[in-house]
């Protein structure tokens, strides 16, 4: 009978790698699982993921792209689904009004001394009211205004003021007694808040001779 540790033809060879070989299947499975987990983690960063609708984030090459559903608001701004307000380039405001006749001022004009107009040439946005001859700002911004008020067959000096919310901002005068037609003209840039009002007021003199061809114009230069 062979002695312990010896084979029939010699000593048994020790196999130090045998136990390692027995563990090899378990080590291979652990490595494969870790590789699969890493692949799953890296998959969204290298492959596009299709969104279910237009407002969900889209992951592409490790960056998050947001598609916003935007719509214009009442004041001309565009508000996205994230609440970001962007001014719309298509929001324009402009008006120009004129006198087409020499009719005498109405009772309303005599009381308030508002210089009113009877014909609108341009009214983009409809923010100039012809009946009251008052312009109402639709939004905060820088506005340009100009006026040209003609007095006819009147030897009195007239003073015309552009009024913002009831207060005079600029004035113009016409008082040459040697001409039958003369105009008081001026222009200005104004910072206006939303709902601010602008109109023309006759501060001095009268327009009893008529004021045909007088004009009042304004437009939004840019919003703020």
Swiss-Prot record:
Record's GO cellular component terms: extracellular space; glutamatergic synapse; synapse; synaptic cleft; trans-synaptic protein complex
Tissues with expression: Brain (cerebellum), adrenal gland and spleen. In the adrenal gland, expressed at high levels in the zona glomerulosa and at low levels in the zona fasciculata-reticularis.
InterPro entries: C1q_dom (IPR001073), Cerebellin_Synaptic_Org (IPR050822), Tumour_necrosis_fac-like_dom (IPR008983)
Short name of any one Pfam family annotated for the protein: C1q
Coiled coil: none
Taxonomic superkingdom: Eukaryota
GO biological process: maintenance of synapse structure; positive regulation of synapse assembly; spontaneous synaptic transmission; synapse assembly; synapse organization; trans-synaptic signaling, modulating synaptic transmission
Predominant location: secreted
Glycosylation: residue positions: 53, 110
Span of the signal peptide: 1-51
Subcellular localization(s) per the UniProt record: Secreted
Keywords: Disulfide bond, Glycoprotein, Secreted, Signal
Keyword Magnesium applies: no
C1q domain location: 88-224
Task of the protein: Acts as a synaptic organizer in specific subsets of neurons in the brain. Essential for long-term maintenance but not establishment of excitatory synapses. Functions as part of a trans-synaptic complex by binding to postsynaptic GRID1 and presynaptic neurexins. This interaction helps regulate the activity of NMDA and AMPA receptors at hippocampal synapses without affecting synapse formation. NRXN1B-CBLN2-GRID1 complex transduce presynaptic signals into postsynaptic NMDAR response. NRXN3B-CBLN2-GRID1 complex transduce presynaptic signals into postsynaptic AMPAR response.
PANTHER family per the UniProt record, alphabetical: CEREBELLIN-2, CEREBELLIN-RELATED
Assembly description: Homohexamer; disulfide-linked homotrimers. The trimers are assembled via the globular C1q domains. The trimers associate via N-terminal cysteine residues to form disulfide-linked hexamers. May form homooligomers or heterooligomers with CBLN1 and CBLN3 prior to secretion. Once secreted, does not interact with other CBLN family members. Interacts with GRID2, and more weakly with GRID1. Interacts with NRXN1 and NRXN2 long and short isoforms produced by alternative promoter usage. Weakly interacts with NRXN3 short isoform and not at all with NRXN3 long isoform.
Name recorded for this polypeptide: Cerebellin-2
Source species taxonomy: Eukaryota, Metazoa, Chordata, Craniata, Vertebrata
Name of the gene: Cbln2
